Amino acid sequence: MKIAIYLPGVFETKTDGYEHVDLSEIGSLDDAAYEEIFVDSCLDFIEQRDDFIKELVKKIRYAGQIIISGSDVYEISRAMMSKNLSLEETNSILYNGRYSISSVLDVVTRLQQLGLNILHKRVNDFKYTIIAERPAPNENPV
């Protein structure tokens, strides 16, 4: 089963082929049950980002994937400093209801710490996309 995480009133996903799951329901989902989890721009609006990522990783079945997209703080800063983004636009991106904002490198590091293999990472404009896979138990020798 494939699920897409959404945050009611803040961020709604528009994805076909996914069952849509409210962010607050993550704890009630079965562990190791999902072949794909899609998280688009929700992490910035969560107070306990690391705990939430850890919980998501538990929900991925072996050989399953997680796709995470979000705003990259370095790219936003770079655009502001090069005057491609006004201060007002920057403030809107950084502070409009967000608890935190990170970079693609921060999220990749966290996913790797949790034992996932990074299959793809990309930054386009201010948004990053990461695809990571949960390896089978015997694929990650210690």
Question: Residue locations for each model-derived region?
Answer:
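Short, hydrophobic beta-strand segments that form beta-sheet elements in well-ordered domains
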Residues: M1-D22
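Di-metal (Zn2+ and/or Mg2+/Mn2+) metal-binding site signature of metallo-dependent hydrolases
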Residues: S41-R49
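Non-membrane alpha-helical segments in proteins
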Residues: S41, E55-L56
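A short acidic, Gly/Pro-enriched loop at the edge of an enzyme's catalytic core
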Residues: I26-D40
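Conserved Rossmann-like nucleotide-binding pocket used by diverse enzymes
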Residues: E19, F38, I67
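Short, well-ordered alpha-helix to beta-strand connector turns
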Residues: T15-Y18, A33-E35, A63, G115
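S-adenosyl-L-methionine-dependent methyltransferase catalytic module, highlighting the catalytic core
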Residues: D50, E55, Q65-V142
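Helix-to-beta-strand junctions that scaffold the AdoMet/dcAdoMet cofactor pocket
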Residues: I46-E47, I60-Y62
